[in-house]
Amino acid sequence: MPKKQDNIVNSLAHTKWNCKYHIVFAPKYRRKIFCEEKRLAIRDILRTICGWKGVEIIEGEVCPDHVHLLLSIPPKMSVSYFVGYLKGKSSLMMFQRFGNMKFAYRNREFWCKGYYVDTVGKNTTAIKEYIANQLERDKEMDQLVLFDPKDPFMGSK
């Protein structure tokens, strides 16, 4: 399979553009909800919504407690508008698909209020690799056993 160029320039009527963003957001209370069926569902929902708005998903990873996306968003659309739309619509679609979630999330608020966004310039390949390996890194961190030291004020016995 030929390697896709990282610096492809897109175009609108009178505009040439290459706008890529690394976006990270998490479910409310940072719950580890994205396992098996819900992981596949949110992946399909995010793809669908991005397709509706003409946003290209370059790379994406759904971790148990957050989502990483590398997106190419047209300049006619603000990042904050799109992320708000994406989180709002995906929330409604998740509650529609999984009715029992209403007990875990009050007021149908599925996502945390904020998100992380970073512009991606010439380092698209590095960001793609980071996102692709994010799930493995999270699993490694979950498997670490932390040393529980004794209380330093109790003395040694």
Listing of model-derived features with the role each one plays in the protein:
Residues 1-157:
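Basic nucleic-acid-binding interfaces
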